[in-house]
Amino acid sequence: LNYGEDWSSRLKNARKLSKNELKDLSLEYGNFIGHKLVLFLKGKEKPDLISSHGHTVFHQPEQGITLQIGDLNQIASVSGITTVGDFRSFDVSKGGQGAPLVPIGDEMLFSEYDYCVNLGGISNYSRVVNGERKAKDIAPCNIVSNLLSIKLGAEFDENGEFGRNGKIQKDLLNKLSQWPYYLSGKSLGIENLEDSFIPILDIYSCVVEDKLRTYYEHISQVIGSHLAGKTNKALFTGGGVKNSFLMNCIQKYSDCNIIIPADEVIEFKEAIIFGLLGYLRINNKINVLSSVTGASSDSSSGSIVYA
């Protein structure tokens, strides 16, 4: 789905809106999603349910706050299909981080891999430790490289070519490596990046290509440090997998057997798993694991709007 410049801008700037303006945007966005789904489903078999993550505006679990907009009532009303969403709030109310949510899918659908790594806006992974699924956000990923690429006139760094042509700035690399988040063990949101990570890159004086090259080296070191074992298999998915230069950098810092699956899995693994979350919720089965979120217990999380 191509949002176009208008919706991309409105969602990006949603954090700046007042409470009432945010409510209005959520209603309008839900209506937009509903109509897009109707168009998408023309000529196709009607699904049993819609599972919607929504657009995250705020995620501050330490303060008990997580907000994803895209009104579920609007989606269900316009589409005529039962809709499930708001998967994070209940976990946060139980003292959890409300993230990550994907590990339940890793456990049920991709358990043959020792690590399941996602290179999305933020990189994260899950694995089994002593019989229990564990997961965490690792480091920034595409959010930051996309922002740097925009300064070079592109929406993203295709195949990592901008970074490939840059040089590592050792002082900048050291500054990025000292980012305090890495000691916190908490989930990572755009707020953390805007407040303290992106400014490190912004104030450093060098060409953008050098910033990208240094950034790739940095996140490769951090990601690689989490993946060990020559006999272990690490499944990589998410948009960052298509950045061949970044993948080569990561391989330098990990001795794991890195597995890159078919394009359908790379692009749609999270969508598939969110469909699973909705299925589990509507059947009142556990869909959020406290072992990865830190909540007081596992839960069947999410709001349901029956059409």
Residue map of PLM features:
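Conserved ATP-utilizing enzyme core subdomain
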Residues: 1, 131-220, 283-284, 293-307
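Glycine-rich phosphate-binding loops at beta-strand->alpha-helix junctions
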Residues: 57, 232-251
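Short beta-strand-loop/turn "lid" adjacent to the catalytic site in phosphate-handling enzymes
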Residues: 18-72
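Conserved acidic residues
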Residues: 47-48, 114, 232-234
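A glycine- and small-aliphatic-rich helix-loop capping segment at beta-alpha/alpha-beta transitions
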Residues: 63-74, 106-109, 129-133, 249-256
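Conserved phosphate-binding/catalytic loops in two-lobed NTP-binding clefts
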Residues: 251-273
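Phosphate/ATP-binding catalytic cores across multiple sugar-kinase/actin-like superfamilies
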Residues: 33-40, 208-232, 281
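Glycine-rich phosphate-binding loop plus the immediately following alpha-helix
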Residues: 1-13, 78-80, 84-109, 115-182
